[in-house]
């Protein structure tokens, strides 16, 4: 999808960019039968207390029911539209099956309106088709990958993401995948995946440009701890601009921040990770 840049006729428009939706998406309204109401919580729990900071004030939207399981086997489906989804970075495609049922799926890179796709145990290796990992050849890029059979895809669903199949392990029960993060892990061979990479890969290149666009997305301002009072944050207080006065940065609740590993050391799925993801610098 092409990126559209704006002229700097105001400071907010300077360096702002956006995806060119009109040139790349079908100009259709969403399928009503696949929409559900999406209430806003503004980061509050059922007691009204803030549990997630910096959330609230987004535009009203509907949730699109996306088919992550792809369990309608051996029935041809035709891609009717490619649409924008406000709830995820990837685009979605409306597919109509031969029996008339309509479903939304994650739109892979290269999928066109009018194209035929299918799910099943033994289907062709082409973009948009869904089948078990054991039947996909080595070197193929896949997305919407299950971690447990019949669970529905949970890995590689965001814009531009994918995983590459490296082969089978010595037992044949597991398929070895390399994720975009660099992590190499084993997944049960019975789990399903969809062939191809997720589309809309330019999503990460968009420059928001001004705070108002983030407010429409439901992202509220983030105040620095050093700008607060000492009773509000461990970094707060002091006369003028002062250092934080601690050996390492802290969270608002006094825990160490930055560089602290947050993954549980005894997590059950650790046994399936062959190589950890690359450490960010």
From Swiss-Prot:
Tagged with keyword Heme: no
Start and end residues of each stretch annotated as Disordered: 224-281
Origin superkingdom: Bacteria
Pfam family, one: Ribosomal_L2_C
InterPro entries: NA-bd_OB-fold, Rib_uL2_dom2, Ribosomal_uL2, Ribosomal_uL2_bac/org-type, Ribosomal_uL2_C, Ribosomal_uL2_CS, Ribosomal_uL2_dom3, Ribosomal_uL2_RNA-bd_dom
Keywords: Ribonucleoprotein, Ribosomal protein, RNA-binding, rRNA-binding
GO molecular function list: rRNA binding; structural constituent of ribosome; transferase activity
One GO term describing the cellular component: large ribosomal subunit
PROSITE patterns linked to this entry: RIBOSOMAL_L2 (PS00467)
GO BP terms: cytoplasmic translation
SUPFAM superfamilies per the UniProt record, alphabetical: Nucleic acid-binding proteins, Translation proteins SH3-like domain
Cleaved signal peptide residues: none
Protein family per UniProt: Belongs to the universal ribosomal protein uL2 family.
Role, per record: One of the primary rRNA binding proteins. Required for association of the 30S and 50S subunits to form the 70S ribosome, for tRNA binding and peptide bond formation. It has been suggested to have peptidyltransferase activity; this is somewhat controversial. Makes several contacts with the 16S rRNA in the 70S ribosome.
Subunit structure as annotated in this protein's UniProt entry: Part of the 50S ribosomal subunit. Forms a bridge to the 30S subunit in the 70S ribosome.
Name recorded for this polypeptide: Large ribosomal subunit protein uL2
Native species: Metamycoplasma arthritidis (strain 158L3-1)
Gene name linked to the record: rplB
